[in-house]
């Protein structure tokens, strides 16, 4: 330790090593607290009253090509859940999203779409009670029609901590519905 550069290097190495050790302790203790709170088995979720709706859209923004109409799907649903066990002192925010998974065109393939999402930033807002909630997004399939396919709905989440890796999970509760067929209301009125 005879010159200023050596002293600075020693102090910087000590600070960096200490910071990494403290960050590791924070990450491990945060994960242990989530495990002790049973955060991965949230048993208080209820997804119900799913009402699918299908409409035709002519816009490129809704999957239309060459102005040919494209079926777009939306849903209306009820959701009851308590996500507060996912919050601790290291939780920055929780990204919650409602997905539907349905069979694809080829055997063994499946498609997954997101109808609704929300960012929750505090434990007080982590209890959701939604009635007749409309989906946030209108979705379309690569195929021309949803053709009365069955879909399984799940509530999934992404926990974003202040320090540490992103943590993905889903609730145990699932619900299912059959995509509605498009009915041309103008033709029905004639």
UniProtKB/Swiss-Prot annotation:
A biological process from GO: signal peptide processing
Transmembrane segments: 10-32
UniProt KW Phosphoprotein keyword: no
Pfam families given in the database record: SPC22 (PF04573)
Residue intervals on the Cytoplasmic side: 1-9
Chain ranges on the Lumenal side, renumbered to this chain: 33-190
A cellular component term, taken from the record's GO annotations: signal peptidase complex
UniProt-recorded name of the protein: Signal peptidase complex subunit 3
Top-level taxonomy: Eukaryota, Fungi, Dikarya, Ascomycota, Saccharomycotina
């Amino acid at each position: 330790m005879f010159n200023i550069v050596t002293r600075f290097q020693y102090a910087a190495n000590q600070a960096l090593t200490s910071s990494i050790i403290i960050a590791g302790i924070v990450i491990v203790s945060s994960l242990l607290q989530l495990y002790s709170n049973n955060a991965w088995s949230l048993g208080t979720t209820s997804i119900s009253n799913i009402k699918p709706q299908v409409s035709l859209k002519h816009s490129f923004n809704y999957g239309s090509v060459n102005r040919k109409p494209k079926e777009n799907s939306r849903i209306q649903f009820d959701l009851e859940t308590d996500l507060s066990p996912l919050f601790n002192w290291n939780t920055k925010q929780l990204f919650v999203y409602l997905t539907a998974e349905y069979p694809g065109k080829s055997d063994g393939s499946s498609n997954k779409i997101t109808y609704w999402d929300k960012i929750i930033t505090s434990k007080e807002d982590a209890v959701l009670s939604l009635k007749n909630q409309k989906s946030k997004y209108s979705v379309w399939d690569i195929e021309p029609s949803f053709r009365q396919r069955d879909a399984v709905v799940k509530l999934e989440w992404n926990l974003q901590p202040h320090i540490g890796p992103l943590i993905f999970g889903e609730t145990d509760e699932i619900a299912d519905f059959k995509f509605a067929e498009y009915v041309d209301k103008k033709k029905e009125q004639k």
